[in-house]
UniProtKB/Swiss-Prot annotation:
Reaction catalyzed: N(6)-dimethylallyladenosine(37) in tRNA + (sulfur carrier)-SH + AH2 + 2 S-adenosyl-L-methionine = 2-methylsulfanyl-N(6)-dimethylallyladenosine(37) in tRNA + (sulfur carrier)-H + 5'-deoxyadenosine + L-methionine + A + S-adenosyl-L-homocysteine + 2 H(+)
Location(s) in or outside the cell: Cytoplasm
One Pfam family from the record: Radical_SAM
Protein family (similarity comment): Belongs to the methylthiotransferase family. MiaB subfamily.
Protein name: tRNA-2-methylthio-N(6)-dimethylallyladenosine synthase
InterPro entries recorded: Elp3/MiaA/NifB-like_rSAM, Methylthiotransferase, Methylthiotransferase_CS, Methylthiotransferase_N, Methylthiotransferase_N_sf, MiaB_methiolase, rSAM, rSAM_horseshoe
Domain Radical SAM core: 143-375
Domain of life the protein comes from: Bacteria
Length: 474
């Protein structure tokens, strides 16, 4: 009987990416297959996130439920990974004796050895170190799971915003070598991937080493990826305003594969609050970036992150945030009520905005952005949009579901043969969370660009390197 693995994931897209790599790793090296049912599993892994309030308590509640499974099956292995594990490693083990292994985001590649150690009767393992980019060197080849894929290009963040735990849980910024990134994307393209989403806590800080000891910037990486045949859409998340430089904006002007949609977190529209947050920029500088982006790509749509009720946020500070939202006309947001994260500088500030006031401000902000998003959706009525078809519609499996460049879900009727490819549809109806389309044409009637075949890239990858180093030489 095959060994079963169950992974529960909380948090950002980077965590989703990490969880997929854990599954690939344990499948390749130890033969574990994924199961949706925790009761069936031989190994349970919890990939945690420390961004939201009471993250630690959420972890212990989940571990309490899993403990009942371990009481029935003493051989069950329970592991905790992610940012809460990195931050609270020993405390987790002290409080939850059922946990066998604790690992951080940078040590997930060591999971096979950790599990083997436990199976051989070893003590509980705690490894939350920061071995820089080592984890990427030991992961198996990527496996496509549809036409869209996430590819991590860097880890960590060195900005140290006063409210954020990421530098403490994922370490400082470390970029993957550009050869490794291009090779992974080429492998995915060979498997039918058409869209890549480049991941990192701060992707525009990317500075990847090249084969000749030079440095590849994020703007250069975007152009390399755009040249790969079959990759017709590029997204990235997340970026920071202070490193959104002109060379990146220039890519929007001449690289159509880069989508007309950008998630650029601002957090607040108040200069006072931005200073308290240690964001490193003012509201006018953020708006300057947006103006230059819209000059390069007039139809680009912007989403952002907002924190309401940050310590010291006055009614005027919140009004400044609402003014920024109106000026920029954001299309979407991830917005949260402020709650202190242990160990961050902001946790020492007096939390002087009442919970009721925070809730009211959040509701006002979200309502405004929802109105703006609906206005953008209505403007799409009657237009023809290029859709990447992801699979059957969630609500009606007889229909197909795809995504526009500006990240809207479109449901429409068409032949299932179009799954995994691009189609053009006319937008005929608008709903709060989706659009309805009418099929116009398939990919065989489009003139899609062909530059550099993935097989050409893979052919340049010398698999028998004596040093065990992989290289892609453009």
């Amino acid at each position: 009987m095959s060994k079963k693995l169950h992974i529960k994931t909380w948090g950002c897209q980077m965590n989703e990416y990490d969880s997929s790599k854990m599954a690939d790793l344990l499948d390749e090296y130890q033969g574990y297959t994924l199961t949706e049912e925790a009761e069936e599993a031989d190994v349970l892994l919890l990939n945690t996130c420390s961004i939201r309030e009471k993250a630690q308590e959420k972890v212990f509640h989940q571990l309490g439920r899993w403990k009942t499974l371990k009481d029935k099956n003493p051989n069950l292995i329970i592991g905790v990974g992610g940012c809460v594990a990195s931050q609270e490693g020993k405390a987790i083990k002290d409080r939850a004796q059922c946990v066998d292994l604790i690992f951080g985001p940078q040590t997930l590649h060591r999971l096979p050895e950790m599990i083997e150690q436990i199976q051989q009767g070893g003590k509980a393992v705690i490894d939350v170190s920061f071995p820089e980019i080592e984890k990427f060197d030991r992961l198996p080849e990527p496996r496509a799971e549809g036409p869209s894929a996430f590819v991590s290009i860097m880890e960590g963040c060195s900005k140290y915003c006063s409210f954020c735990v990421v530098p403490y849980t994922r370490g400082e910024e470390v970029s993957r070598p550009v050869d490794d990134v291009i090779l992974e994307i080429a492998q995915l393209a060979e498997q039918g991937v058409r869209e890549v989403n480049l991941l990192g806590q701060n992707v525009n800080a990317y500075r990847g080493a090249t084969h000749d000891d030079d440095i590849c910037t994020f703007a250069e990486l975007l152009r390399y990826v755009a040249a790969i045949d079959g990759i017709d859409r590029i997204r990235f998340t997340t970026s920071h305003p202070i490193e959104f430089t002109q060379d990146i904006i220039d890519v929007y002007e001449d690289t159509p594969e880069l989508v007309s949609f950008l998630h650029l977190p601002v957090q607040s529209g108040s200069d006072l609050i931005l200073t308290q947050m240690k964001r490193g920029h003012m509201a006018i500088e953020y708006k300057s970036i947006i103006r230059r982006l819209r000059k390069a790509r007039p139809d680009i749509q912007i989403s952002s992150d907002f924190i309401v009720g940050f310590p010291g946020e006055s009614k005027q500070d919140f009004a400044d945030t609402m003014k920024l939202i109106e000026d920029v006309q954001f299309d979407h947001s991830f917005s949260f009520i402020y709650s202190a994260r242990p160990g961050t500088p902001a946790s020492d500030l007096p939390d002087d905005v009442s919970l009721d006031e925070k809730k009211e401000r959040l509701a006002i902000l979200q309502d405004r952005i929802t109105q703006q998003a609906m206005r953008y959706s209505r403007q799409m009525l009657g237009t023809v949009q290029r859709i990447l078809v992801e699979g059957p519609s969630v609500k009606n499996p007889m229909e197909l579901r795809g995504r526009t460049e500006n990240n809207r879900v479109v449901n429409f009727e068409a032949d299932p043969k179009h799954i995994g490819s691009f189609v053009d549809v006319e937008i005929v109806d608008v709903f709060t969370n989706s659009l309805r389309g009418k099929f116009i044409r398939g990919e065989d009637e489009m003139d899609l660009r062909r530059d550099l075949r993935p097989s050409d890239i893979l052919a340049k990858h010398k698999k028998d390197d004596d040093l065990g180093v992989t290289q892609f030489i453009p």
